[in-house]
């Protein structure tokens, strides 16, 4: 249903707008996008987001945009290819239902700061078993078993921050390099991470780029078309992951939990196209081993579609 709404919005051809203050987007993660017959670990995720430009003042030396956003989403986690035998499980079965609110500050020097809070629910209350089994039955996929071992219900709250800064841009304007860092502290994910981001192609300044959701503009501003490839390796030091370790505050976290690998390298390679109202992004993500078990490294694909108005 959500995809149909977005396709209708994209197909709509209205009069040219002198400002775009709002954006709706849908984001989908799935290891099936890799076409390697894999259905395991972080196996599916979907989220819907709304962003609004709330303030733009480019008159000051440290001119900036302010954009706030909200996101609701759902994630599914399985053991290796859905194995139900307890002895073969290398990751907990669980689902995560969440909502997030954030605010971003984007500066003329092409640095940015994003602060947010996320509240979520793990366990049966996140409806992972019903959603996954219903989807598999609808499309005639294999039978899922193992949800009887899922993590216990628990609520999480995280505070998150992300900072990025432009390091250099080529004289042609077709290549740039930025440094990005992120941090999360809470009951779900606690980590710190940092790494470079390389972009190649037709680029906008980072305060008007799809890369950080800043293409929204008021009257008198022009945001050009973008078309670029990007590569983002980021090294994380991880303190807690509730999808693997269970509820931090629970004594009985569930029948299957594991410890986490503290160091993880996450690499993303992708392509973005953005023009007028529409933004489309597709990327692949490759993570090194996350779980202290027989679980292997994991990878998945992502697709995002946004419509600004």
Give the location of each predicted region.
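Glycine- and aromatic-enriched membrane insertion/assembly motifs of diderm outer-membrane
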Residues: 48-79, 116, 121, 276-279
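Outer-membrane beta-barrel biogenesis signature
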Residues: 16-21, 56-64, 208-224
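N-terminal ordered "arm"
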Residues: 20-59
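Outer-membrane pore/translocation modules
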Residues: 24, 72-218, 229, 240-259
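Bacterial Sec-dependent N-terminal signal peptides
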Residues: 1-21, 309
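Outer membrane beta-barrel transmembrane domains
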Residues: 34, 81-83, 203-309
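Transmembrane beta-strand segments of Gram-negative outer membrane beta-barrel proteins
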Residues: 17-29, 66-74, 179, 227-233, ...
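Feature captures outer-membrane beta-barrel proteins of Gram-negative bacteria and organelles
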Residues: 44-53, 100, 159-165, 192-202, ...
């Amino acid at each position: 249903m959500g995809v149909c709404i977005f396709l209708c919005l994209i197909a709509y051809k209205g009069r040219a707008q002198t400002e775009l203050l709002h954006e709706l987007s849908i984001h989908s993660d799935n290891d099936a996008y890799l076409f390697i017959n894999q259905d395991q670990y972080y196996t599916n995720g979907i989220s819907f987001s709304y962003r609004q430009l709330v303030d733009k003042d480019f008159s000051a030396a440290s001119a900036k945009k302010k954009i706030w956003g909200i996101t609701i989403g759902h994630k599914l986690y399985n053991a290796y290819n859905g194995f139900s035998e307890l002895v073969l499980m290398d990751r907990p079965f669980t689902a995560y239902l969440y909502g997030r609110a954030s605010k971003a500050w984007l500066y003329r020097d092409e640095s940015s700061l994003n602060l947010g809070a996320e509240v979520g629910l793990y366990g049966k209350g996140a409806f992972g078993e019903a959603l996954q089994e219903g989807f598999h039955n609808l499309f005639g996929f294999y039978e899922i078993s193992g949800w009887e071992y899922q993590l216990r219900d628990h609520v999480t709250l995280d505070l998150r921050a992300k900072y990025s800064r432009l390091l250099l841009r080529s004289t042609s304007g077709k290549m740039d390099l930025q440094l990005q860092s992120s941090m999360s502290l809470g009951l779900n994910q606690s980590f710190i991470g940092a790494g470079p981001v390389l972009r190649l192609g037709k680029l906008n300044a980072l305060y008007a780029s799809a890369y950080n959701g800043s293409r929204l503009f008021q009257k008198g501003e022009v945001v050009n078309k973008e078309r670029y490839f990007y590569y983002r390796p980021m090294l994380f030091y991880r303190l807690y992951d509730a999808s693997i370790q269970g509820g931090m505050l629970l004594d009985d976290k569930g029948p299957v939990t594991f410890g986490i690998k503290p160091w993880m390298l996450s690499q993303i390679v992708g392509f973005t196209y953005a023009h007028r109202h529409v933004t489309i992004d597709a990327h692949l993500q490759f993570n090194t081993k996350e779980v202290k078990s027989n679980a292997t490294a994991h990878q998945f694909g992502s697709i995002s579609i946004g419509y600004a108005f």
